[in-house]
Amino acid sequence: VMGDMDYTPLIRKIKELPMITEVMQPDYYPIVSQLTAIGQFDNWEGLDIPIDTPVPVKLFLGKEDFFRFYDITLLAGEWLDDLSTYEDIIINESLARRMGWSPQEAIGKHIIQSYITYTIVGVVKDCHYGAPTLPIPHTGFLVGEQMGLMQRSAGILFKYKEGTWNECRKALEHLYQTECSPENILRLNSEH
């Protein structure tokens, strides 16, 4: 559910559903979502020869709870947290290697996207969140109020017991109809 509302009562009711095993606050959107920002990185620390085509990077919101929800492993550095700034970034290992670094070497390095210089504070293990036949996308994770559009697009992420999706979907649709105003948007994405 997306929209301007107090999510607390809805989250409480979702947690009460017998098929639900975990619920997160509405701070993120699904990693398989099409609601991703794309950054274009064209310079980084140690780049000797300018590149002709910027490296596209899918950007997501992500603090430690997000990574734990998706069971994404931190290979080097630290998680983003409430003290992190918009200039701090966690990248995946494929992006670190594309830039010529091991995960450990990437920590503290700087990458540049037009007018923003990011400091790499963490590197996470690659994970497939697209088709397994496609290469793993270069991915970055950020926090901060400057990510306003991404924050406003956030929804409630949850996990449910295997084999209960149809029952879960029906229960969520019923909650949406009884607990949400028509201005709110219901999007149900199922990840396997």
Language-model-detected regions and their locations in the chain:
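Mid-to-C-terminal secondary-structure elements
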Residues: R12-H192
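Membrane-interface junction motifs in transport/secretion proteins
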Residues: V1-Y7, Y29
